[in-house]
């Protein structure tokens, strides 16, 4: 499942600038839910993709990273700045917990 998301994101990132239909089709296959009027500027990076739900009128500037190890829900009319990372998991930051 993880490799599938990465393969689809790679295909998305290789689409032409005018290939709106191809991009939409890849997002529909990659993501759990895709609203209307969603635009994501490549490159897009995902952990899975299949755990991300996007609402209507979502715009993501270049370099969106979705670490969707668990479900990610993005509502309607959301805009992401360049190089945003949405992460549902992480590593311990306290030194004692990292030992």
Summary of predicted features, one role per range:
Residues 32-34, 38, 46, 72:
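Hydrophobic beta-strand core residues of beta-sandwich domains
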Residues 44-54, 59-99:
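Flexible, glycine/small-residue-enriched loop-and-beta-strand segment within the central core
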């Amino acid at each position: 499942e993880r490799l599938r998301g990465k393969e689809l994101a790679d295909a998305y990132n290789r689409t032409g600038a005018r290939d709106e239909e191809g991009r939409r089709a890849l997002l529909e296959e990659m993501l759990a839910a895709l609203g209307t009027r969603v635009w994501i500027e490549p490159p897009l990076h995902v952990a899975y993709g299949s755990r991300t739900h996007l609402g209507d009128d979502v715009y993501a500037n270049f370099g969106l990273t979705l670490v969707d190890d668990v479900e990610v829900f993005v509502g309607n009319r959301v805009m992401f700045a360049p190089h945003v990372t949405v992460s549902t998991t992480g590593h311990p930051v306290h030194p004692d917990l990292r030992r």
